[in-house]
């Protein structure tokens, strides 16, 4: 019915007799564009097949994540995927974690979720920057984790090179900030306006492994240093 109505409106407009279309209607061209985008993302792709070959160590992402327990670490590599596929994978993972914390899988055997689940995202400025489109699926999922995840025991841990490029709703909901060495151009942005000039100068001179921690429980920034490995490392 939507398609027929939209087609009729297009025809009337072409004939010069059409009336102004309701803003809630979706044109035929929009439907076709949506279909092309979906088909391009999932058609003839092994990631969307209806079977998982256990002999090749394949598994359903949701089936693996919902069996997470204490001290488990799951690594999902999306670097080689396109942006559309990255959105599918990230959305599926976060939605499974939410359903797990909401008790959607309590009736299944072997389900024993930990009290807290930490979602670590490397290069956060790639997925949740200020330049990311407003309706980006990955950005919406990240914002959902930062704004609602804390009440469910889901914590976002992000790592990025430039804090000033991160979306304001992400940094605004972070309780703890860890600052590593950076340049004076970065510290001159308004994201660092709350830091005293003394700490800004320290950020430009920090050594490798040194960080400044900012948390409401500390009256001032706390400097920490990661210990060196207890074993000798050889560089090629």
Feature names for model-found ranges:
Residues 11, 28, 35, 75, ...:
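Ordered hydrophobic segments in well-structured contexts
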Residues 16-95:
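Conserved P-loop NTPase mechanochemical-coupling segment
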Residues 49, 75-77, 120, 158, ...:
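Structured core elements
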Residues 81-202:
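Conserved P-loop NTPase motor cores
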Residues 210-236:
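Conserved P-loop NTPase motor module
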């Amino acid at each position: 019915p939507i398609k027929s109505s939209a087609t009729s409106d297009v025809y009337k407009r072409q004939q010069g007799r059409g009336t102004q279309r309701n803003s809630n209607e979706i044109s035929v061209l929009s439907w076709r564009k949506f279909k092309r985008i979906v088909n391009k993302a999932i058609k003839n792709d092994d990631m969307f097949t209806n079977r998982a070959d256990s002999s090749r160590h394949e598994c359903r992402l949701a089936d693996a994540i919902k069996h997470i327990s204490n001290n488990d670490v799951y690594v999902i590599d999306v670097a080689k995927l396109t942006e559309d596929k990255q959105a599918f994978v990230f959305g599926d993972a976060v939605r499974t974690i939410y359903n797990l914390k909401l008790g959607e899988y309590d009736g299944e055997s072997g389900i024993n979720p930990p009290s807290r689940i930490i979602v670590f995202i490397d290069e956060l400025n790639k997925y949740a920057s200020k330049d990311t489109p407003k309706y980006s699926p990955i950005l919406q999922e990240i914002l959902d984790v930062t704004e609602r995840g804390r009440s469910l025991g889901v914590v976002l841990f992000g790592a990025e090179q430039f804090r000033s490029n991160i979306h304001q709703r992400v940094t605004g909901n972070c309780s703890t900030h860890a600052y590593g060495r950076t340049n004076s151009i970065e510290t001159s942005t308004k994201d660092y306006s709350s830091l005293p000039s003394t700490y800004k100068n320290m950020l430009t001179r920090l050594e490798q492994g040194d960080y400044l921690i900012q948390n409401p429980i500390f009256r001032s920034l706390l400097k920490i240093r990661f210990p060196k490995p207890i074993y000798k490392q050889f560089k090629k």
